[in-house]
Each structure stands twice: as C-alpha cells, then as structure tokens.
Amino acid sequence: GKTICLDYSSINIAKRFHIGHLSTTMIGHSLRRIYDFLGYKTVGINHLGDWGTQFGKMICAYKLWGNEEEVEKGGVNELVRLYVKFHEEAEKDPALDDQGRAWFKKIEDGDEEALRIFNWFKALTLRDTERVYKLLGVTFDSYAGESFYNDKMDRVINELKEKNLLTISEGASIVDLSEDNMSPCIILRSDGATLYATRDLAAAIYRHDTYHFDKCLYVVAYQQDLHFRQIFRVLEKMGYEWAKDCVHVAFGMISYEGQALSTRKGHVVYLEDLLE
C-alpha cells in the first residue's frame, strides 16, 4: 500500500489549544480518516512548536514569578499567565528580554536545569492538550517537533553547500529563487542562527527517509503559502525527486470580531471553553 504523511495541528508548547488550531486539526484528521478508509497507510505528525527564544522567556518568568505547585496544577493556563506577565513587565524593563535570551541559550547549550524546566513545560502542555484531542477523537503517530531537528540541520546545510546552492546575501546564507519569481529562502541568519526553512527541509528529508511516503501533506494556513513553495523548490533543486509529492493543503484563518488571534495579546478563544 501507499504511505501518506500528514502534518497537522502542530501546536505550540506552553500555549493553550485555541480555536485557531481547530481548522488544521480537523482538516488533517478528516483527510487522515479518508485515506485510512481508502486503504492507505497514514502517518499523523504533530510537528510541535517547541523551540525558540520564547522558551527562555517562559523559564525566566517562571524563575521570577512562578511557583512549582501552581504550575503543576494549573498547567498551560498558568504558563500562559506567566508568559503574558513577562511581556507586560518586559515593556517596562527591556533587560528582561536579555535574561530570556540567556535562558534560551542555556537550553541550546544543554544546561541541566534549563532542560529540566523546558521538558516539564512540554510535558504539561501535552498533558493538557491530550484532553482536547480526546474530546475531538484525534490521534498522532509522531510528536517530533522543531527541537527534534536540532541535530539534523547541519546535514542539510552541508548538502546545500556541496551542491553550490547557498549564496551569502547581507551576511545571511540563502538559496536564490529569483528564477522562480520567489524571494530567497533564508537558511542561516547573519548570526548563524537557523530558521524555520532549515528545519522544514530537515523534517521533509527525515520523513522521506523514515516513512518513504508517497505523499506528504502539510495542513497549514494559507499565510504559509510562499514558505512551502520555497521549501518544495529548494528540495527540488537539491535533487530530491519526491519534492513533487509534498503538498501544502492551505486553509483560511479564523478571526474573531475581525481580529486575528494572538496569545501574546490575550486575544483568543479557547477550544475547551467552546466545546464545553
């Protein structure tokens, strides 16, 4: 039989599951059930948003204002409260942002305390989100998210270098896509930091190596259209025939009272409130 990978839901760690996640989750889940029914082998992937400086900020907020018992009990709600507080305080005291960055650097460097707290936040988020998935009847085979690809990006960068696809532009390493009428795909920032594109290239290659998919569907909002066109084109340029089997299943965003949803601004409708 043929194998279909479906990348859907893809929640962010330390944020509540809100109504904006409903489209990707239910469209992905529905497609999966249809493919299952048709006899395909399906692999459901929840590509967790579990990397970035915001986790340094979360730890910083926890160290300053958090309480272990309250976080353990309150779970994601308490983490969101701390996150919002951090942003309020950082507006008055910009030095907090530096502290947040320093904590994230600790996570990157494998500091024991930082990793312990980071993994705990992750476990709490999955615990709370699992309740929502149960209500919806949604399951996944893999929760390999952004951090999973940390050690898989060098391979991509080296391969791009070997194939002479990388160009330096304003200090950043890019793949030039001007002949495809697209803006460049940025692989490394000028400070050497990797970006979403680097991770998504690593993820696509890993998925093909691991699952040997016949199709890989990305159920992600239409705003990411250019991003995926860039990724698929770069994979083609790298010589991966299967790039044509990667498909972005785009959908419209849910807005509420005419505004986009933002956890940071507290402008959000939570799914559990809706379902209950």
What is the role of each PLM region?
Residues 1-276:
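NTP-dependent nucleotidyl-transfer catalytic core
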